[in-house]
Amino acid sequence: MKTQTTWIASLLIAAVGQTGAFAQDIRVDMNKVYPEKTIRLDEVASVRYIPLGTTDDVLFNGKIVHLSDEGIAGFNKKEGDILVFDGAGKVVGSFNHLGQGPQDYPQIYHLDVDWKQGEVYVQDNFRQKIRIYAPDGTYLRTLNSQGTMREGDMYHYSDTHLIYYKNPDGRQFAPYQPVTLFSKKDGSATFLPFTKTDENIVKATGGPFGDMKLNAKHVSSLYKLGDEVYVNEVTADVIYRIEKSDALTPLVQRTPSYQEAVGKDYFLVITGANARYYFFKRQQALLEFKGNAATDTKSTFVAYDRKQKSILQPTFIHSDYPSLNITLDKLKQCAGSSNRCFLLMEAFKLKEALAEGKLKGTLQSIAEKLHEEDNPVLMVIEFKK
């Protein structure tokens, strides 16, 4: 045991350059079957609903990436639409700069918003740029990123900086410092003292073009959950939280180690952080193709209960929609206000549930006013301590 402890400590030194006390004693067993539990949201959280505004020009069928009192932002990746709402769901702006011009983006990889500065930051990996617009779509400026950013791993960090996770240079992996603070003013970069020593990417076998690495939708390396930023590092078996001082604090440790043969089947990914729980995904590391799609059949989600100090597989239910089982794969969290998770509820599905008599209370009243073609309703969940 002493040898194993010393070995894990050495990995921490390699990953961050210094040892540090864990913020909490959280250890996730990657091979354990944790107990299942049904939890009433009415007992552990407050719930409210935000119907996203609908106009002829604002139709949302994409991804919400920012949720706060100041506003909500999302994008339709295929169409290139960026949609901005206020905190109550009213449309603030809708724009599309998909194109090849100097003020355009050829594809949206990710975006975030700084409401104080009135700026929307769009990740353009194709050209290694960050395009900056006002919430109404007015073009402001472009910054050159310092290398290629990982898809989805770019966020508003402070009044003066963005933060992103840099991909390795070249085809051959070598240890490097990927966590980058990026000046919003001049594009200068500062690298946090965190060294990445191995790749953490999901792979798939049996594809039409042979074995392949899959993109960041399976395992991101940088997450902004509410107003806190987290770093996943599989080599050191640790998830870190970036403090306001820019220091990295180890938060969660996985067992067995990814370095051991019995630990290589899964990656540990943080998917939620709130006053009551931390949510994690145990991501299957090696997928198999069936036809043209890689299938993920073994990944599981677990929660660490910060009050009970235990790990479980929860299913949440709510009195407004008693027959709806809210599992952790459906519950989302993004950048924005802390302690907020959400469920994206499509209008046509709510109308179907209403017709079947499945809705009650506030959600029933909202559904009665919806049209099937309307934009989704956000079920916003704020957990209690």
Map each language-model feature to its residues:
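Blade/loop signatures of beta-propeller domains
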Residues: Q24-I50
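Asp-box/WD-like beta-propeller blade repeats and closely related beta-sheet repeat scaffolds
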Residues: N125-P178, F191-G207
